């Protein structure tokens, strides 16, 4: 909505609000979202409490399989029926956020929505349904143990 579009994200970018949940050549994009230093808080702050219905969050789960081991056939055929002993092992995508927290600043204090150190999900659609003063996302690590974590979408209605 308009509120999300017009509210800046501290340490973030409007690329998180453009509706693209993955790079797609149909949209003319080769990349989307932003990469943030682990431990950096991405915060929406409001001048007064605003009613938020839902929050949408999408991390990079390497749908293009660029970080998987092996050659193209190994990366593109995820449901192999014949697995050789020397076949590359599949694992959680290295680009996926592993540890993060999501909290709301409410008139009565901070409300933790998600605080996980073993995330396996690419996308979240979270019902909020309350008036909040701020929304804060902090990615702490990813499965590839790099210094930055890529976030594709972080918006609300």
PLM regions with names:
Residues 1-21:
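Predominantly extracellular/luminal regions of secreted and cell-surface proteins
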Residues 22-110, 118-157:
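Aromatic, loop-rich ligand-recognition surfaces of beta-strand-rich domains
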């Amino acid at each position: 909505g308009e509120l999300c579009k017009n509210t800046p994200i501290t340490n973030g970018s409007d690329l998180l609000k453009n509706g693209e949940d993955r790079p797609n050549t149909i949209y003319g994009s080769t990349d989307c979202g932003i990469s943030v230093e682990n431990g950096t808080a991405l915060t929406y702050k409001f001048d007064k409490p605003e009613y938020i219905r839902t929050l949408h969050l999408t991390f990079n789960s390497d749908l293009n399989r660029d970080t998987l081991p092996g050659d193209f056939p190994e990366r593109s055929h995820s449901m192999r029926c014949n697995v050789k002993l020397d076949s590359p092992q599949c694992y959680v995508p290295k680009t996926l956020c592993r540890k993060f927290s999501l909290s709301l600043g409410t008139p009565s204090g901070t409300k933790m929505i998600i605080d996980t150190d073993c995330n396996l999900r690419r996308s979240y659609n979270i019902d909020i349904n309350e008036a909040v003063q701020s929304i804060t996302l902090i990615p702490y690590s990813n499965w590839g143990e790099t210094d930055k974590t890529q976030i594709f979408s972080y918006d609300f209605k």
